Amino acid sequence: MARFLTLLVVSIAVALPLSAQDSPKLEVFGGYQYLHAGNFDGAGDSVNTNGWNASATFNFAKHLGIAADFSGNYKTEQSEGSTADVRIYTYAFGPVVSANASEKFRIFAHALFGGVHVPTGCFLFSGSPNECGASSTSGFAMMIGGGVDARMTKHFDFRVVQIDWARLASEFGAQNSNVRVSTGIVVRF
C-alpha cells in the first residue's frame, strides 16, 4: 500500500506542469484558532476552546499542494467546585487545492488526516488535594474544509477565514460535531 501511494504521488508530481506557476512554492500560516469540540467528554458535553493554528503548504503544481497542519487549543473548565485544564492538540497532513478567485483573493480547500492528542489535565477540587489523571489519550483526526486568503503584499496574505469540519476520535469516543475556525497571516515564498 505504501509503495502504491508513493508511486501515485510521484506520478502526479511529474505529470503536472510545474513551469507556468503563479502560486508560491511554499506558504507558511500562523494564527488564532477557535475549536468547538462536541461530545468532548464522551457524555455528550461540548467545549469551546481558543488557541493557535500553524501550517505549511508546499505547492508542487499551479493549483495543487500538500499541507502539514498543527494546532493547540486550551480552556479551563469550572464546574461544581472543581476546575479542569482542557488541552487539545492536532497534527494532520493532506492535499490542498487552491485557485485565484481574483487578483486580491485566493480560495483553497483541503482534506487533512492525522492525529489528536489530549493530555491529562489536573482536576482541582475545593477543599481537597489536587488530583491528576494517570494517562493521556490520542486518536485519529480528520479535518475537511477550506478558506480565503486576501493578498496584502507580494509575500504576505491575510487569512480572512479558514473553516473546517473536524472528526476527532480518542478514548472519549468519536467527536463528529467539531468545527474549527482560524484566521491569521500567511507568508509566501
Model-inferred region functions:
Residues 46, 151, 163, 168-172:
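Subset of outer-membrane beta-barrel
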Residues 27, 55-128, 139-145, 150, ...:
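Gram-negative (and chloroplast) outer-membrane scaffold detector with strong preference
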Residues 1-23:
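Cleavable N-terminal export/targeting peptides
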Residues 39-43, 77-84, 127-134, 168-172:
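Extracellular loop and loop/strand-boundary signature of outer-membrane beta-barrel proteins
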Residues 35-54, 137-138:
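Surface-exposed strand-loop-strand hairpins of Gram-negative outer-membrane beta-barrel proteins
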Residues 22-39:
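Short N-terminal segments immediately surrounding and downstream of signal-peptide cleavage
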Residues 32-36, 73, 163-166:
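Generic short beta-strand segments
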